[in-house]
Amino acid sequence: DKALSAIDKDKAFISALVYGVTERKITLDYFIDKYIKGKIKPKVRIALWIGAYQLLFMEKVPSSAAINESVNLAKQVGQDYYSKLINAVLHKIDNDRKIPDDLSVKYSVPQNLINMWIKQYGEDEVKAFLPCINDKPPLFAIANKKFVNSDELLYELECSNVVGEAYDDFVIIENGVDLTKTKAFKNGLFYIEDLSSYNCAKALNAKEND
């Protein structure tokens, strides 16, 4: 059903936006505070977070859509007075997307935590692992071999608008998708597992019902 598919896509988008803003708050505040001096209302900052996150980290979202939706959001929560400010700040961020090399700002990690890590592990080690800190691990849909192989599972998932890639006896899917809502999951065609658990089971030659 097209309507349900659209709803699921909206839910996935909103979920990615909420988690993304939470993870990248330090980076977002750097850009917002660069153009706004002094305190701003929490609702206004939230609208700016949402717009700035889309501009900086969601390449598929057009700038105009990110800015317009944030302005509309502010109006919907009674912040019409600040709509022009939000519009102006987001346009400035859109024209100035370069994230500085400062480790705290670049990776959205509190400065005191970075200082502690550097003291414990050294600056080179910290710089090496920080790029991975915000990476989202992929999901592994393990095919239930009673019913399907990985290629057949991929086909079933694609029928639910899920994009993935088939390997051995599993399908790798980018995170941010609710696989439990798919018809394939409800029909028991696969189960969800992280890579470490999967590798442990393979190493132990785990059999069904073990």
Model-derived segments and spans:
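Rossmann-like S-adenosyl-L-methionine
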Residues: E152-D210
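Class I Rossmann-like S-adenosyl-L-methionine
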Residues: D1-D178
